[in-house]
């Protein structure tokens, strides 16, 4: 059965975007009614002399939103073919755990498949690197399609 709704976990690294462009050109979009383009900004907490600082904070994130929204739209045009006639939704948020936020979003949108791009870590790098892709494969409520850089 072909998926009728697809989520694309959009990274910002060029190395990880290229495989998504290739996948988008090869994928049969004729049966897809919804495409969800998702990017989650990772929040970090940094200890400083005067206390803990959360980055990006709420005001910084609000300043980033217009640029990130444009980025999502621009990248969607590179991934989705001009012949795509379904609805396209953009999701942008921030969280300490982008993986958990993504899983929550996947449950809310009830997509058939999520497409993620992996760094392709192998050997010791793979053992010590807990990746977004690994968590999607383990905990996603839908099918996961993994694309890899060449």
Q: Positions of the model-derived regions?
A:
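Solvent-exposed polar/charged
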Residues: 26-29, 107-108, 138
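Short, flexible loop segments at boundaries between secondary-structure elements
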Residues: 139-150
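Small/aliphatic-rich secondary-structure junction motif
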Residues: 2-58
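Structural beta-alpha unit
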Residues: 78-114
């Amino acid at each position: 059965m072909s998926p009728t709704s697809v989520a694309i976990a959009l990274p910002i690294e060029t190395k990880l975007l290229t495989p998504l462009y290739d996948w988008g050109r090869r994928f049969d979009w004729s049966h897809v009614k919804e495409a969800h383009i998702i990017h989650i900004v990772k929040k970090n907490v940094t200890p400083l002399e005067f206390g803990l600082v959360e980055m990006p904070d709420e005001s910084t994130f609000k300043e980033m939103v217009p640029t990130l929204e444009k980025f999502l739209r621009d990248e969607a045009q590179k991934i989705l073919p001009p012949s795509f006639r379904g609805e396209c939704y953009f999701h942008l948020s921030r969280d300490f755990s982008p993986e958990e936020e993504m899983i929550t979003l996947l449950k809310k949108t009830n997509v058939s498949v999520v497409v993620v791009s992996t760094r392709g870590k192998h050997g010791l790098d793979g053992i010590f690197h807990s990746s977004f892709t690994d968590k999607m494969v383990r905990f996603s409520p839908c099918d996961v399609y993994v694309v890899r850089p060449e």
